[in-house]
A protein has these predicted regions:
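Active-site helix-to-loop segments that bind/position phosphate- or nucleotide-bearing substrates
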Residues: 1-31
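Extended, H/D-rich, highly charged conserved domains that either
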Residues: 35-36, 40, 44, 48-49
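Long, charge-dense
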Residues: 50-99
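C-terminal accessory extensions appended to soluble enzyme cores
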Residues: 142-203
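A short acidic (Asp/Glu
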Residues: 56-60, 118-124, 143-147
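Structural motif
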Residues: 43, 106-109, 111-115, 135-138
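Short internal beta-strands
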Residues: 46-48, 131-138
Length: 203
C-alpha cells in the first residue's frame, strides 16, 4: 500500500492527480502547509484512509474514505472493528511502526485526531527511535504519555481560543507555530522537545 498503492492508480485518472499535501482542504492541513512549504527540513507524511501512509509529495487523486466512525455515513467506518480492518488493509500500523523506527529523523511531530491515531495502533506500535511531540485530547494522551521518547501536549478548546483556531484545525495551527518559531530562531524545536519545558511557553 502507501506509495505502491499511489503508483497503481490507473493512468487515465492521473491527469486529475495533485500532490497529496494539496489534496486535503481541511483547516488543519491549510494551517500547517503554510509553514511546511517554507521549512525545507520537514519530511511530511500523511495517514490516508485511501492510500495508507504516503509522502506529501506523492501524486494522488481524490477518494471517499475516512477513519472517522459514523454508521450513518457511507464513506465512514461503521464500527471500531471496521476501522481496524481498513487500517490493516492499508498496512498503516506496520508502516507507522517502521516510520517511527527510522533513525534518520532528528525528531517527530504527530498531528492526528483520535480516529486516525487509532488507525496507527499506537499502544502496540509506538516506540519512537527519536524524540516525538504529540498533540491530543485528554483521552488520547492518557496512555501515550507513558511511552518513552513521546512528549504529549494537551490540545483542547482553551488552546483553540488562545490561538484563534477551530478545534478541528488546532493541531495544524500548533504545528505551524512550531515550524515558524524554528525558522525564526533555530533551536526552538529543541526547547519544545524538552520534557521539563511547557511547549506552550515556547510558541
Amino acid at each position: 500500500k502507501g506509495r505502491k498503492h499511489v503508483q497503481a492508480i490507473p493512468k487515465q485518472y492521473m491527469k486529475e492527480a495533485v500532490l497529496a499535501k494539496d489534496l486535503y482542504i481541511g483547516g488543519q492541513q491549510i494551517n500547517l502547509m503554510k509553514s511546511v512549504s517554507q521549512a525545507s527540513f520537514v519530511d511530511l507524511k500523511i495517514v490516508s484512509a485511501g492510500y495508507g501512509i504516503i509522502d506529501g509529495n506523492d501524486k494522488t487523486v481524490g477518494y471517499d474514505s475516512t477513519f472517522k466512525i459514523d454508521n450513518k455515513k457511507p464513506d465512514c467506518c461503521h464500527s471500531k472493528s471496521e476501522q481496524t480492518q481498513l487500517a490493516n488493509a492499508l498496512e498503516i500500523p506496520s508502516g507507522f511502526k517502521k516510520l517511527l523506527q527510522d533513525k534518520s529523523y532528528d525528531c517527530g511531530l504527530i498531528l492526528l485526531g483520535d480516529d486516525y491515531l487509532n488507525a496507527c495502533d499506537p499502544f502496540t506500535n509506538w516506540n519512537p527511535a527519536f524524540p516525538t511531540i504529540f498533540f491530543g485530547t485528554k483521552n488520547s494522551i492518557k496512555n501515550l504519555k507513558l511511552i518513552p521518547n513521546v512528549k504529549c501536549e494537551l490540545a483542547n478548546q482553551t488552546h483553540a481560543k488562545k490561538y484563534s483556531a477551530g478545534v478541528t484545525s488546532l493541531k495544524g495551527k500548533l504545528g505551524a507555530l512550531i515550524l515558524e518559531a524554528e525558522l525564526e530562531k533555530p533551536g526552538t524545536i529543541d526547547k519544545c522537545l524538552d520534557p521539563n519545558i511547557s511547549l506552550y511557553s515556547v510558541i
